[in-house]
Design a protein with these regions (language model features):
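Oxyanion-hole/transition-state-stabilizing segment in secreted/luminal serine hydrolases
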Residues: 50, 55-68, 80-117, 136, ...
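Charged helix-capping and loop-helix junction motifs
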Residues: 112-122, 157-163
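Extracellular/periplasmic catalytic domains that process cell-envelope and extracellular macromolecules
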Residues: 40-44, 63-64, 91-92, 172-173
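Catalytic His-Asp segment of secreted/periplasmic serine-dependent ester chemistry enzymes
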Residues: 142-220
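Acidic/histidine-rich helix-loop elements
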Residues: 23-24, 66-79, 107, 200
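Conserved beta-strand scaffold positions in the cores of enzyme catalytic domains, especially
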Residues: 49, 69-71, 178
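A short helix->loop->beta-strand "cap" motif at the edges of active sites that frequently abuts
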Residues: 130-134
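N-terminal secretory targeting modules
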Residues: 1-48, 60-61, 220
Length: 220
């Protein structure tokens, strides 16, 4: 009986380890989008927008009147997720790449310095593989917890400023263009302006128009 129990424990442990090893790193939507992006080629005349739900939520080619813009945003993505799906972009050697990321990392208690380190790794990969690609690193936007929609962001308001400080330092070190969007979206309390959102994090149409106007000179 004792041997049987020991065997059962060993089998259960092996099964648990197997499940842990094969568990997906990201959610289903990430893989649906990432595998689609694998099948959609990038060319040297394209402008890539790489990001999370804020990027995913816009029709950038229509907003900016440029059919060469390719949206590579994925809802819920973290900066390491960008790195893990970067290869198809590197292969295409796009003309420009606009990057925004880090708020989902913050929701998982990742520090600004850690976000900066992963973002720097991503930028170095782009520079090494696509030396002619112009890189634009955009700041994080504020969020607004008055809406009480995202519990994992509660108490993390100041983390955005820390992350932006780290990201700007990355942009300076790597010699890429830094676009500070934060002041355009923050109210006097440092929160996302309530008229630009309906959930405290994501943008309504007016917010995307502000974003568009801030970056259109770089897209040309």
């Amino acid at each position: 009986m004792k041997r049987l129990l020991t065997l059962m424990v060993l089998v259960a442990g092996m099964w648990a380890a197997s499940v842990a090893e094969t568990a997906p790193k990201y959610d289903d939507y990430y893989y649906r989008r990432a595998t689609l992006f694998d099948a959609l080629p990038i060319t040297g005349s394209d402008i890539v927008f790489l990001g999370n739900s804020l990027t995913d939520g816009a029709e950038w080619n229509e907003l900016l009147g440029n059919s060469h813009i390719k949206n590579r945003g994925i809802v819920g993505d973290i900066v390491q997720g960008y790195v893990d799906r970067l290869q198809p972009i590197l292969k295409g050697k796009p003309k420009k790449i606009f990057i925004m990321g880090g708020v989902n990392d913050i929701s998982h208690d990742v520090s600004g310095d850690s976000i900066g380190r992963v973002m720097e790794k991503l930028i170095v990969l782009v520079k090494q593989n696509c030396p002619k690609t112009k890189i634009y690193l955009q700041s994080l936007l504020p969020f607004n917890n008055d809406f009480k929609r995202y519990k994992r962001l509660l108490g993390h308001e100041t983390w955005v400023a820390d992350a932006n400080c780290a990201l700007k330092a990355v942009a300076d070190r790597q010699g890429v263009v830094w676009i500070d969007l934060y002041p355009l979206f923050a109210n006097a309390d440092g929160k996302l302006r309530p008229e630009l959102t309906n959930d405290g994090l994501h943008l309504m149409g007016k917010g995307y128009l502000i974003w568009r106007d801030a970056i259109k000179k770089y897209v040309k």
